[in-house]
Amino acid sequence: RVVAAALAAGCRVEPVPGACALVAALTASGLPTDEFHFAGFLPHKSGQRANRLAGLAALPGTLVLYESPFRIERLVAELAVALPERPVVLARELTKKFEEWLRGTPAELAAQLQV
């Protein structure tokens, strides 16, 4: 709740790096941290990805996925179908010079990625 309030106030939130990118991204995302599910990387095949996302959509709490930068636009498009209203945070290059955070619905992230 503190991170969400800081983000709403326009403050920049930076994670403290540790041994786990998952925790660093989660703690600075502004999404609820009281319950989360880590799904790792999704399968490469379209049907398997759709099935996995359908299963994940039923889970409560925050979902954390890893994805290759080469497939991120595909993932955002798939999220727009499977979880169209779910808040999404895309965190990349954490703790590096070009760290980037995108926040919004899957459709909003898709628009941000097209810029």
Task: Annotate each PLM feature.
Residues 62, 66-115:
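A contiguous loop/helix-start segment that scaffolds small-molecule binding in enzyme catalytic cores
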